[in-house]
Amino acid sequence: MYAVFQSGGKQHRVSEGQTVRLEKLDIATGETIEFAEVLMIANGEEVKIGIPFVDGGVIKAEVVAHGRGEKVKIVKFRRRKHYRKQQGHRQWFTDVKITGISA
């Protein structure tokens, strides 16, 4: 059984027991969260597709950890003008473990 849901403007395909990295959520570590924006649920041959969301579809998950991703360097450069600029960015994320999928 697997499902597709959206969180943080992105879509994720998950199954029970899987750990997923999402955009930062303001929820404490160890708490549970329910995602109601379920786009599709598949259980073997039976597939439910939402328009846009599946009625009664809920994905339950537990927050495992928060953190920051690897640094991405942004470089701006103009040749022959002695102009160089560097900037770094580290995106916050939340790891969640899927505990249940229901339709």
From Swiss-Prot:
Q: Which domain of life is it from?
A: Bacteria
The entry's cellular-component GO terms read: cytoplasm; ribonucleoprotein complex; ribosome
InterPro entries per the record? bL21-like, bL21-like_sf, Ribosomal_bL21, Ribosomal_bL21_CS
Instruction: Output one GO MF annotation.
Output: structural constituent of ribosome
One Gene Ontology term of the biological-process aspect is: translation
Which cysteines pair up through disulfides? They are: none
Say if the entry is tagged with keyword Zinc. no
What keywords tag this UniProt record? Ribonucleoprotein, Ribosomal protein, RNA-binding, rRNA-binding
> Which PROSITE patterns does the record associate with it?
RIBOSOMAL_L21 (PS01169)
| Binding partners and assembly | Part of the 50S ribosomal subunit. Contacts protein L20.
Tell me which NCBIfam families the record gives. L21
This chain's function reads: This protein binds to 23S rRNA in the presence of protein L20.
What's this protein's family per the entry?
Belongs to the bacterial ribosomal protein bL21 family.
Q: What name does the UniProt record give this protein?
A: Large ribosomal subunit protein bL21
Query: What gene is behind this protein?
Result: rplU
